[in-house]
């Protein structure tokens, strides 16, 4: 049996552990490309131990910025995108990756908060430590998601009781709301979490899974992106039930097709990735047009220095290095 845990609106929930006035109101965390590292101001920074989308590698202790200081640029324009938002904000149509400007237009009373990556990193590590004390095998899938393999450790008829125990322990010790999905295999447990949100638990047995998933749209399954979704719809495959009916087609696509079919059907999807192998490391920043070549060189040197810190912390020895520059009109140089 597998348990998948996903912290609800993690960045918002993390901020609410510090400020209870944020409860039950529309809240969003907004991010923008942080160019503080180019500043001559002395700020203590650390390297993040978590690696995930919308999570900065460079953590600054200078996080107490106002809305004006963080989101409004020198020309008075509101900058940044929504990295996560509360369910109260989602009712107004606010979504992840939406511009802060658009989010405020949809929800004028939206409470915008600059990110505090040090806090998120700390809470994620605390959750991992908690789970490692309660579960034999865990995989950290992202900064706010974990898989737990409890096969042979928790009986199936006791799995719901154990999930409630974990949920209460996480709330009591970390003050974080969490959604939990339970299934016989890894990726089906992740799918179940979508039906546990917000702040719930969803368990479907292997016997009932085909019926439960037959009408679920293919785009709801982890690993089916936009391009693959369009490809599958070209074969008139629109639901997970359609995937189950087309074994020969998926097996003809070799490994990628076989893996997807098996994940959807709950076949041989029972291995956790305890430690992920890093294939690349990088750091980058976006900023307004700079006409001074010396300033551009200075910024490249600063980024290179931070990259060297990350490489040292990860204890790796890269075989190659590259610099990628994207210009104002989409022209690239490497």
Positions of the model-derived regions?
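Residues that scaffold, gate, or flank divalent-cation-dependent active/transport sites
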Residues: 1-143, 147, 257
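Long, highly charged, low-complexity intrinsically disordered interaction regions
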Residues: 158-217
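Short Gly/Ser/Thr- and Asp/Glu-enriched loop/turn motifs at secondary-structure junctions
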Residues: 141-145, 183-186, 316-320
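Catalytic palm subdomain of template-directed nucleic-acid polymerases
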Residues: 148-167, 236
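Short, structural beta-strand-to-alpha-helix junction motif
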Residues: 99, 217, 239-240
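DNA-contacting surface of Y-family translesion DNA polymerases
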Residues: 228-334
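Generic non-transmembrane alpha-helical segments
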Residues: 126, 130-134, 165-174, 231, ...
């Amino acid at each position: 049996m597998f348990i998948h845990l996903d912290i609800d609106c993690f960045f918002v929930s993390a901020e609410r552990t510090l400020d209870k006035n944020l409860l039950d109101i529309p809240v969003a965390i907004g991010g923008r490309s942080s160019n503080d590292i180019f500043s001559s101001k002395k700020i203590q920074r650390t390297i993040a131990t978590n690696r995930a989308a919308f999570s900065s590698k460079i953590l600054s202790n200078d996080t107490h910025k106002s809305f004006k200081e963080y989101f409004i640029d020198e020309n008075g324009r509101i900058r940044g995108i929504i990295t996560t938002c509360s369910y109260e904000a989602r009712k107004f149509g606010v979504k992840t990756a939406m511009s802060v400007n658009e989010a405020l237009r949809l929800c004028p009373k939206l409470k915008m908060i600059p990110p505090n990556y040090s806090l998120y990193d700390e809470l994620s590590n605390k959750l991992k430590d908690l789970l490692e004390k309660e579960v034999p095998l865990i995989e950290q899938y992202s900064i706010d998601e974990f898989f737990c393999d409890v096969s042979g450790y928790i009986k199936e008829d006791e799995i719901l009781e154990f999930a409630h125990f974990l949920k209460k322990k996480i709330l009591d010790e970390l003050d974080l709301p969490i959604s939990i999905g339970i299934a016989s295999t890894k990726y089906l447990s992740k799918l179940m979490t979508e039906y546990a949100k917000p702040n719930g638990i969803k368990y479907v047995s292997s016997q009932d899974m085909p019926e439960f998933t037959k009408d679920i749209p293919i785009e709801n399954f982890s690993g089916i992106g936009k391009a693959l979704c369009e490809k599958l719809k070209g074969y008139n495959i629109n639901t997970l039930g359609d995937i189950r009916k087309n074994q020969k087609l998926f097996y003809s696509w070799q490994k990628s097709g076989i893996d997807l079919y098996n994940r959807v059907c709950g076949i041989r999807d029972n291995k956790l990735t305890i430690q992920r192998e890093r294939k690349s490391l990088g750091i980058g920043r976006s900023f307004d047009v700079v006409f001074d070549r010396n300033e551009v060189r200075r910024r490249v040197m600063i980024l290179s220095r931070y990259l060297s810190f990350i490489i040292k912390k990860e204890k790796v020895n890269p075989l190659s290095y590259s610099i990628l520059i994207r210009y104002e009109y989409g022209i690239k140089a490497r």
